[in-house]
Design a protein with these regions (language model features):
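Short beta-strand-centered segment that lines the nucleotide-binding/catalytic pocket of NTP-utilizing
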Residues: 135-151
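Extreme N-terminal, non-catalytic leader segments
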Residues: 3-8, 49-111
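Short, surface-exposed, low-complexity cationic segments
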Residues: 36-54
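Conserved nucleotide-sensing/catalytic segment adjacent to the nucleotide-binding pocket
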Residues: 149-212
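Glycine-rich phosphate-binding P-loop
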Residues: 111-133
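Residue-level preference for the first positions of well-ordered beta-strands
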Residues: 109-113, 213-215
Length: 249
């Protein structure tokens, strides 16, 4: 009876025992434990779905355990991951992983400019992209507008205190009598957008100066904002205009 209990205890111990820790030495000669969660997030950043990223991470980890090495260089993990992605999902996915790893090692900040009309999903997309890419700094142009409204009263700058699509109502009288309603709305939007371009430029320039990634989103993000950015910077700047092309009925 005692032998049976001892055997059961031994089997339970073997089952519950934590897998060995695998140490990873990076390019700066620093040693950290291999993290499956970090590896999984890295693969998600490459555009893999949650299921595909989990599958690839699991297979890479199994290969590391089978190798039996207590410490490995980070380059070997990259090589194993590249091979695993190629076998599971094809060469394009594996190449995308290499591109992402090259970018993360470059130290270049990523600036995403998300523009689009109200209700098209800018904030939702910004939140999801920030999570996937590990970007901690996001900024809404609506919040910048609220700060400006606190600083500048309505009687001095009424166009700032309307919504972007009703800003035309605060245009000077000589302009507000134009017959073309669409042109009026566009002129009002551009007028408010130009006012918001000042704090938007400040936010972007600070991110470039501190070399941190940033997502700037809002209706005031316009293609002309690219002219405000010093192209001598080595940041990766991606302007994106979001639209709902087919409305559900």
């Amino acid at each position: 009876m005692a032998k049976t209990n001892d055997k059961a205890l031994a089997e339970a111990y073997e089952t519950n025992r934590q897998p060995p820790t695998i140490l990873v030495r990076d390019q700066h000669n620093q040693v950290v434990p291999f993290s499956r969660s970090q590896h999984y997030l890295c693969l998600e950043s490459c555009g893999l779905s949650s299921e595909d990223a989990a599958l690839a991470t699991s297979q890479v980890y199994e290969q590391l355990l089978e190798g039996g090495e207590a410490e490995i260089p980070s380059s070997k993990i990259g090589h194993l991951t590249y091979q695993c992605l190629g076998k599971l999902f094809g060469g394009k996915t594996a190449h995308r992983y290499l591109v992402w790893i090259h970018y993360t090692h470059s130290g270049r900040p990523l600036i995403l400019l998300l523009g689009g009309t109200t209700g098209c999903g800018k904030s939702t997309i910004a939140t999801e992209v920030a999570h996937r890419l590990g970007i901690v700094r996001t900024q809404s142009t609506d919040m910048l507008r609220e700060v400006m409204r606190m600083l500048i009263p309505k009687r001095l700058l009424p166009i700032l205190h309307n919504s972007a699509f009703n800003a035309w109502q605060a245009l000077p009288a000589r302009l507000s009598y134009q017959a073309d309603e669409e042109k009026l709305i566009a002129d009002g939007y551009r007028s408010q957008m130009e006012l918001l371009s000042v704090p938007c430029e400040a936010v972007i320039q600070r991110a470039l100066r501190e070399r941190v990634s940033l997502i700037l989103e809002g209706v005031h993000v316009h293609p002309s904002m690219m002219t405000l950015i010093d192209r001598r910077e080595d940041a990766v700047i991606v302007p994106i205009m979001i639209a709902v092309l087919k409305q559900d009925k």
